[in-house]
């Protein structure tokens, strides 16, 4: 879908002078063309970011994939589309190269913003019948062992159907956006970002008793921690963690509203896979 540009929020990587300077140049460039823009630093404060984004029609995020992920997670359900400007290394989530930002913004102004809705995840941790922790994820929700090199025991259920027990280093529940992250390193599948599905991939499963699964977006996954001797943690997008206890049940499902990404279609998904080394042409 397309949306008209009214005002723009520019979010810069925390403590990054290059990002701050570029943000100010962008603000001045947009102001010269009649658009209001505000520059804020990504401090990790979800409330202040949500307030800043209330009046904007687009959020430009200046940084690497980590910065883009953090901002995207805090904008879940806000209805504000996000466009990443790559100042990092991999830059798979970024649509715009920092060296070509002016031409990219010119395309935005001339054609409006094309918005793509992507599936995101919500989760909650149930302990003794009560919810003790909850949140959202743009890339993945991971349940993994602590510092000791021991497998952990998890019990998996999809809806009312029990899949069985998994003994592994952990489990990755990934969105299509996160399929090129931790999930693919654990032999999870590449998934087109426009598909409304999510994947379940074990990390080093003992005896390989569970292969990666692709679940419909409407499916609800429940993971019960059976381990009583090892440390077990839940992490969201590799950035925020929570210690789990034996008997905890982690419920994962599709987040309402999903995540909105703006696109200017400079590079197709398949060309991006090739450019980042996920597909290698042998010809």
Curated annotation (Swiss-Prot):
Its main location: cytoplasm. It comes from the Bacteria. Its EC number is 2.7.1.23. Keywords: ATP-binding, Cytoplasm, Kinase, NAD, NADP, Nucleotide-binding, Transferase. It catalyses: NAD(+) + ATP = ADP + NADP(+) + H(+). The active site is at 65 (proton acceptor). Its cofactor is a divalent metal cation. GO terms for cellular component: cytoplasm. GO terms for biological process: NAD metabolic process; NADP biosynthetic process. It is found in: Cytoplasm. NAD(+) binds at residues 65-66, 139-140, 150, 167, 169, 180-185, 239. Belongs to the NAD kinase family. Involved in the regulation of the intracellular balance of NAD and NADP, and is a key enzyme in the biosynthesis of NADP. Catalyzes specifically the phosphorylation on 2'-hydroxyl of the adenosine moiety of NAD to yield NADP. This is NAD kinase. It comes from Nitratidesulfovibrio vulgaris (strain DSM 19637 / Miyazaki F).
